Amino acid sequence: MDIIKLKHITKRYDDGFIALKDINITIESGKFYSLLGPSGSGKSTILRIIAGFTQPSSGQVFFDGKDITDLDASKRHINTVFQNYALFPHLNVFENVAFGLKIKKKPLNEIRPAVKDALHMVRLDGYANREISELSGGQQQRVAIARAIVNEPKVLLLDESLSALDKRLRKDMQFELRAIQKKLGITFIFVTHDQEEALSMSDEIFVLNDGQIQQSGSPVAIYDEPVNDFVARFIGDSNILPGRMIKDYVVEFANNKFRCADGGIKSNEKVEVVIRPEDLDIVAPEKGKIVVTAQTQLFLGDHFEIKAIDANENEWLIHSTNGVKLGQRIGLFFDPEDIHVMRLNESQKDFDARIEKYEGDENED
């Protein structure tokens, strides 16, 4: 069931800067969504428009089928957890979580059990009387979430809310947030510039750049089938090479022809080829589909990151559990399914239509 729809949302500021360009988004109830993109891509502006803190220049916002474009933020069934958590330092944990309920003039006999349940949900039982200054960053994060969910919103918005935490705590909170969302069964919309956060937590991701949605879909679909160069480079590490489509299932790059899993592209059309570094296997040069020379190598704990160059001066990034010697000639082996072919300047709409048509033609055969 759809809970939020943005239709043709544009945001233009007085200085002429266009933050959002014809944004169309559908959010289903009970799922975890991420708005992912670099700084200035428009992701936080979308969040603020959904929350009611910012008005769009044009377009409509729908909530449960009703137009709420002009509805005051306080009247929306939506709560927000901000990047700095916005906790009140002069109030203890209980008072922070209870704040919204007190504003609504709820009686104390309703507030106490509601706050207790919210703190239990975020695993902060026994912390009600703690001062905010006594809490770690992760605990403050959970208090902010408890304060938001105690109001029983239908949608929870989180604006870069893990960015202030250290790497280990950020990883722990990814599991925590996903678990909380599953328990509550409400819609989470999470804004981040961190691809790992988006990939690990989301049911669906919207990738933004320059005020436009570049691609939307499941984490697996976006990682395995980026629609353009920006998405391929922004989501994970990639080897991206210029190529030419020979025919269905055959593509040429690095002066060789290779079997691939892509079709529906014109013969001789210029394309870009994406191969993820973890899909490259290091083999003996005579067994490799491509031969490269190792240039640099970093040990990253669970794998080596190797940069190499082929005879055509193409650079290759390889992730391997085995290291190599610098200057060593090595073979790279990959399967047809490891090759992803991208058309130049193809939109997601055109990409989806091509795949649907091509797969439909295959089924008829």
From Swiss-Prot:
Binding site for ATP: G37, P38, S39, G40, S41, G42, K43, S44
Subcellular location: Cell membrane
Superkingdom: Bacteria
Keyword match Zinc: no
Subunit description: The complex is composed of two ATP-binding proteins (PotA), two transmembrane proteins (PotB and PotC) and a solute-binding protein (PotD).
Function according to Swiss-Prot or TrEMBL: Part of the ABC transporter complex PotABCD involved in spermidine/putrescine import. Responsible for energy coupling to the transport system.
Protein family membership: Belongs to the ABC transporter superfamily. Spermidine/putrescine importer (TC 3.A.1.11.1) family.
UniProt protein name: Spermidine/putrescine import ATP-binding protein PotA
Gene: potA
